[in-house]
């Protein structure tokens, strides 16, 4: 198993958040367009929250601390 580098792990989430933010909207109409946009908004929020987390190891568990302030 590869060794986990937490800083690189979090950086990948920041990169994913930026990619979601920059990608264009495909040619969709109606409900499909609305669903796609909502999904992209959720993806961005999820990736950006994890990407800005502070981390620690506590009793063999990775602990991510995510501030809810912007």
Residue ranges of predicted features:
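Compositionally biased, non-globular sequence tracts
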Residues: 1-70
């Amino acid at each position: 198993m590869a060794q986990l580098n937490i800083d690189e792990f979090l950086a990948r989430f920041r990169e994913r958040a930026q990619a979601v933010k920059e990608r264009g909207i495909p040619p969709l109409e109606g409900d499909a367009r609305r669903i796609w946009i909502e999904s992209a908004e959720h993806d961005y929020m999820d990736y950006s929250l994890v990407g800005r987390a502070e981390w620690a190891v506590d009793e063999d568990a990775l602990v991510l601390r995510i501030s809810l302030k912007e």
